[in-house]
């Protein structure tokens, strides 16, 4: 029946952590789409995915026009959007990152050469606040596409696995992730022999990883991460089987989707005879721009030589030439273990690292790897400047923000600049995840941190270059990182020889190697463990054993890069004089109202008097930020006087306010309810030692004056002396004499 609803179910057994049920449904919602499926997680979280395709191919395109969109509906979590118009606007960062998670295993699963427009829209319709919807959306997108009658080699399954108390747990909740050492999203497909080929990995250590490892948990080393990939396989099999069961009941037959005609053997042979020597020579040029210029010349030469014979078949010549540089480079790597720029498969390009690359900023660093150049810049501010989030996630604020910019100048081109594209958001998020596990806690370093990575030159893995530049920039800004982090991009070349697929892993890939290679595998970490990992592949899948070997190869490269970075900076520098100074004070919760005062009068007065900025948390923690240390300390002293009153001591210096003048001196308010007398004989010091007839000639009511408590009599009366710049040493000598 056309309107019949079909179901399939996958039960995930997590042992002591219980079970998760992923249920697929089709035939009830979005019935006019080519394929639609609803995925439920424990009947509590619901994602609707719909796949549609254009009727005719876009023959003028030289790429596959696949679009993935994720629509977060705030009603899913029982919220009303916080925007002015109270409706959803541009996609959140979470939605954009989920789009990329869906796209990465989906794209290589389509028939090669397909030019029909394909759109997949995943709508988050219901969400348990303790669930993460991204992996549910990955499976929903696979299921809806499998049902759509498209040339698609699915299904594939996506699962999040987290290492919690020594066990890999599938589909963990936010609550469970608080105890996780490592968190990993893995997508893969089941092969004919029953094994699972990995198609996509997105992984990270957590904020608590360092502490958990100190407490005895197993560190997420390369071997542990490889074990996590193996642990994900049984879960992926269960998910793929459920989708296959659903497709057996409801999938449309695969339609006719013609692809551009492949090049004839005659064209390939003619092209080989015409320019093979020139092409081979061009592919040995190390410099990116010189190599690309020579490849353009060879392409023009090929057209010039072949057009008389293939008149009117310019597109065919162009199509024949397009894969040649890639296939020739790959063939050289497989046979000779030599790469475009002459390096061996494990060699790293020349590295350079320096800090304090630009003036006045709070922290900066420049990292170069070959032609890839990244500038990292750190800015520190009060915690009230942390990013406020209005999303479906239970996380509402983010004190560490990592922004990645990729202007067209980085590749020597013209182009649009402005708001970040999906790629820039994704690269920034990857670099952020690599750094977060080693950041200090709010209590250890009460600052909002904005890290900006400027890609000033690009020829391979600017995202991993951003990790390296950010580590050095943060250290230069004085951020006490738990450990330095570096990153490296790995590539993979595969070729079938005598029916067997051979793989060669490449360390530190170039942009061209990323383009013609079969895998982009980015790994970041400390000397001890992996902090972030990302895998993209153009193949239907990669054996887990190949990935495990690439992980070990990446570790050797990472350690070498860390050594170079540590030569530039290995410990946190002193904070820049341009950075704000932030200190904390803890007060009783019942004293918060007194510090704020009626209509915020008290807190506003403290901020006005000292120039400090004050943020008060609900638990009584107060963050005080100022341009310099003395201003912050003055604010802290005032707050302590209100909420944590202590008896003043002789020798204590306080910035006070004149509250009354008399013929014999001025009364200065030091703390709420505590005044002291600055005698007229002492006021003359403020007038350069001249005789003072009227106190008002030197001090007025409301004027600020730095004073020191000189004496406290038996009745608690305070006698003050002024603190004069240049005379502080003399004051210290008097204090020593008095003590003797």
UniProtKB/Swiss-Prot annotation:
Start and end of every S1 motif domain? 651-723
**Cofactors (names):** Mg(2+)
Q: Which residues form the KH domain?
A: 580-639
EC number of the protein: 2.7.7.8
Its localization reads: Cytoplasm
One GO term of the biological process aspect: mRNA catabolic process
Under the heading Pfam families, the entry gives: KH_1, PNPase, RNase_PH, S1
Which keywords belong to this entry? Cytoplasm, Magnesium, Metal-binding, Nucleotidyltransferase, RNA-binding, Transferase
- On the tree of life, the source organism's domain of life is Bacteria
Q: Name one GO molecular function term.
A: RNA binding
Q: Which Gene3D superfamilies match?
A: GHMP Kinase, N-terminal domain, K Homology domain, type 1, Nucleic acid-binding proteins
- Family annotation (SMART domains): KH, S1
What cellular component GO annotations does this protein have?
Answer: cytosol
Q: List the SUPFAM superfamilies hit by this protein, alphabetically.
A: Eukaryotic type KH-domain (KH-domain type I), Polynucleotide phosphorylase/guanosine pentaphosphate synthase (PNPase/GPSI), domain 3, Ribonuclease PH domain 2-like, Ribosomal protein S5 domain 2-like
Mainly localized where? cytoplasm
The entry marks the following residues as binding Mg(2+), namely 514, 520
Give the catalysed reaction(s), semicolon-separated: RNA(n+1) + phosphate = RNA(n) + a ribonucleoside 5'-diphosphate
What job does this protein perform? Involved in mRNA degradation. Catalyzes the phosphorolysis of single-stranded polyribonucleotides processively in the 3'- to 5'-direction.
Q: In which family does this protein belong, per the annotation?
A: Belongs to the polyribonucleotide nucleotidyltransferase family.
HAMAP family per the UniProt record, alphabetical: PNPase
Subunit info here reads:
Homotrimer.
Q: What is this protein called?
A: Polyribonucleotide nucleotidyltransferase
Q: From which source organism is this entry?
A: Streptomyces antibioticus
Q: Which gene encodes it?
A: pnp
